[in-house]
Design a protein with these regions (language model features):
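Extreme N-terminal starter segment of soluble prokaryotic enzymes
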Residues: 11-15
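N-terminal amphipathic/basic-hydrophobic helices that include classical n-h-c signal peptides
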Residues: 1-10
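Internal, well-folded beta-alpha domain core
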Residues: 101-263, 268-271
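Active-site helix-to-loop segments that bind/position phosphate- or nucleotide-bearing substrates
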Residues: 16-103
Length: 271
């Protein structure tokens, strides 16, 4: 398998992950000094959701009454700039539990802040230490906002452009040079396609597959894949990964890199 993307700067490597539906509030661990960059669009979404009837909100969220009522109250009382929780602590799903950011060391926080980007239907792109409030909105939700047919159209190329931003990531760069931008994809298809659709020739987009062999085929199971994605973020932060090839050493929970089933676009880890 050929290797590539051997640039020197850490900022060239980006990791994308999905958000989690379940969110918590933690205003004590870290003070939030910044908010995500697309707050104007977030405000548009908030206003649109608040303008829906309760029945419409519940249909949008595809949930039971208890969860719908909780989120209707959240949106009615929502202040996007107060009582903020760092995003990496706010999302409370399986991959975040296994990432275990609450016990990161200082260097690991700095690493994820530089490299990790959380894709969100509500905020667009979120850096780990940016402050967010609990919300419920999935990218595939049927939300026709601002004349757009859905949220993929609403966000357009914004997520790609923001993920690719960095001191050494220049959208006008010469894509023929061997210093391509590298994205490690740990997101679900629902979110990764917000980026994939806009990839340029010089971009290197590597999806990590975490699976088990069943009858000679790689089978990826949802819960276990989420666990492994979280552990991969933690692993990358612990080794200060700067090149994609470094993540091939990932060995948590019995996984091992399988070069025969991997390619330039997919890194396959089997256990």
């Amino acid at each position: 398998m050929a290797s590539g993307g051997h640039g020197q700067e850490a900022e060239k490597l980006r990791i994308i992950i999905s958000p989690a539906k379940k969110m918590v509030v933690d205003t004590d661990t870290f003070a939030c000094k910044e908010v995500p960059c697309f707050m104007e669009k977030t405000q548009i979404l908030k206003d649109w959701i608040c303008g829906l009837s309760y029945a419409e909100q519940k249909a949008l969220w595809k949930c039971n009454d208890k969860i719908a009522q909780q989120n209707a109250e959240r949106f009615a009382q929502m202040d996007l700039y107060r009582n903020l929780t760092p995003a990496i602590l706010a999302y409370d799903g399986i991959q975040y539990t296994y990432m275990a950011p609450a016990v990161f060391e200082d260097g690991q926080y700095a690493y994820v802040q530089d490299h990790l980007r959380i894709l969100s239907a509500f905020y667009g792109v979120v850096k780990p230490m940016e402050g967010v409030v609990p919300y419920r909105l999935e990218m595939q939700a049927k939300a026709a906002v601002n004349g757009c047919r859905n949220l993929y159209e609403f966000w357009g190329e914004d997520l790609y452009r923001e993920v690719m931003k960095g001191d050494d990531i220049d959208e006008n760069r010469d894509d023929s040079r061997d210093d391509s931008r590298v994205l490690i994809n740990l997101a679900s298809k629902e979110y990764s396609k917000c980026i994939e659709k806009y990839l340029r020739p010089g971009d290197r987009f590597i999806t990590c597959i975490f699976g088990e062999l069943e009858n000679g085929k790689v089978v990826q199971k949802g819960v276990y894949a989420k666990m492994a994605r979280g552990q991969m973020v933690r692993y990358m932060a612990s080794i200060n990964a700067r090149q994609p090839e470094q993540i091939q050493g990932f060995d948590r929970d019995g996984y091992a890199f399988d070069p025969d089933r991997s390619s330039e676009k997919e890194y396959c880890f089997i256990r």
